[in-house]
Every structure is written in C-alpha cells, then in structure tokens.
Regions:
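Cofactor-binding beta-sheet edge motifs in enzyme active sites
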Residues: 1-282
C-alpha cells in the first residue's frame, strides 16, 4: 500500500447567485488538482465560470472509478443542497427547477418516485438526501436514507436511477449500478490513507476500512431504457451519485454539513463542516 498510486486529492470552491424564483443566475466552480471530469454543471445557469487548476502533488496520482467526477459531483450536489436550504426550497424541487435537460429531469424524477421522496417522514436521527449528475454520456440520480446513532452513520437505503441510452443487457447494467453504489459507499464513508511525519501509516490492508456486509444498504436500481439513443458506458458514471446523496442525508439528519471525503470513517466529527470549500481526500 505504501507503493500504490493514490486517487488525486483536491480542493473545490463553489459559489452561486440565485434569482428570486430560485433559478441559478450565476455559477462559479473551481477544482484544484483532482481533475476536470464531471466539472461542468448539468443544470441551466445564467452565466458560469468553471475551471480546473493543476497543482503539484507530493504523491503519485492515478485513476479512480469515475475519475474526478466523484469529487466534482460531491462538491456540486452538496452545494446545490445548500442553495436549496438557503431559500427554504425542497432539494428535489430545486433541482427540477434548474434542470432543463430532459434526460437529467427523467432520472431525478425516476429516483424520487421509486424512493418515495415526497412521502418521506422525518424522525429523530433519520435523514434523506438526493443528488444528480451527468458523466460519460450517462445521467444518474440517487436518493439515500441514513440513520445516525451516537455519531455512527448507517446508510439504510439507496435508490439510484441511471440512463445511458439504449439498454443492451439489463442484468449486467443493474450489476454495474449496484456495484458502483457499493464501491462509492466506501469512498464516501470509510476509505482513506493516513499520514504522519511524512510517512504512510495506513500500510496494511487490515488497516484500510472498506464497506462490510453490515454496512451495505438496501440498493434499488431504476434503469431508464432509451432505445432512441445510442448506448453509452455504464462502468463509471453510477458511482458519482452516492457520496453527495449520503452527505445531504447526513445534513438532513444532524444539521452538520460535511465537506470532505471520507465523511465518517470513525463516526461523525463534532462540529463538522464550517467552511464553504469542498475537499476530496485521496
């Protein structure tokens, strides 16, 4: 593990100005180091500035499933939630208001309908989150339900809708979506490399926390089949929805906005999330 390449770490800054009706008038998004994949917002905005800034890393960097789209979607979709809450608008309605692309709207609505978003019931220690996005020709939306007990976060249920054009092999596609959710859960909640005194101290696989059977939620996939659209890949895009959906659910349950990955490797930190910057740990 001390020799391996690392997913690029990065810092992401996001900013926006809203119109009185809740549409996005101005949008600004900067990714430092982790990459440009998934950088561009899929939402309709009045004007935008979106840039990826390269920087030198002390670590050897390489690819992660979905590349930087995992980090960019985490930052953007959590920030979309912040914007929705700032004007007291439901996060689903806020996304639909700003989503003009038919395919994006379809996956958002499909995930919300299957999840039962409008009939969700808020109880103590229970939270619900939603996210959406686009990458590599595919559109994805995820809804997550989590529970929090004494700082320990349990992802209870995930519904993910995915559309990548014409579906050729439905069973294999469902496996890709569900596998991406499982892998994305690890990056969202647990997986990290720790350093001390310029050395890697997570130097054994037994010290590297990955999702266990007990961590796995109920996963439901909704596959939208568009026979009128040429098939796109499905191996990477489904991973981008899980982290922001869980992050938004944690906020819904606790009022804590966590802005770095992984979010809760050892439970929720006290007073998490006080900055407007989003960071992705490799």
């Amino acid at each position: 593990m001390t020799w391996a390449y690392f997913r690029p770490g990065g810092v992401i800054d996001a900013g926006a100005r809203l119109n009185p009706d809740g549409t996005i008038a101005e949008w600004e998004f900067h990714n430092y180091n982790s990459g440009p994949s998934g950088l561009q917002t899929p939402y309709e905005v009045g004007s935008k500035k979106e840039h990826q800034h390269q920087s030198k890393s002390p670590l050897r960097q390489s690819s992660y499933r979905g590349l930087a789209a995992t980090a960019n979607h985490f930052a953007r979709e959590c920030y979309m939630d912040e914007l929705a809450h700032s004007i007291q608008m439901d996060p689903l309605e806020f996304r639909l208001k700003n989503a003009k692309n038919e395919r994006l709207r379809n996956v958002i609505q499909a995930a919300a309908d299957k999840f039962g978003w409008k009939s969700r019931k808020k109880t103590l220690g229970r939270g619900f989150g939603i996210s959406a996005g686009f990458e590599k020709g595919g559109y994805v939306a995820a809804c997550a339900e989590i529970s929090v007990t004494h700082g320990a976060v349990k992802v209870v249920r995930v519904v993910e809708a995915f559309e990548c054009g014409a579906v050729v092999n439905p069973e294999h596609l469902a496996n890709q979506v569900e596998g991406a959710v499982a892998m994305g859960l690890g990056g969202a909640m647990f997986e990290q490399i720790d350093f001390a005194d310029n050395k890697i101290i997570t130097n054994k696989l037994s010290h590297y926390r990955v999702p266990r059977f007990a961590d796995m939620p109920v996963i439901e996939s909704v596959l939208l089949d568009r026979k009128d659209i040429v098939s796109a890949g499905a191996g990477e895009t489904p991973i981008v929805g899980i982290a922001p959906a869980v992050g938004n659910a944690i906020f819904d349950a606790t009022g804590q906005r966590i802005r770095s990955l992984p979010m809760a490797p050892k439970g929720l930190p006290a007073g998490a999330g006080s900055s407007s910057s989003m960071a992705n740990g490799g």
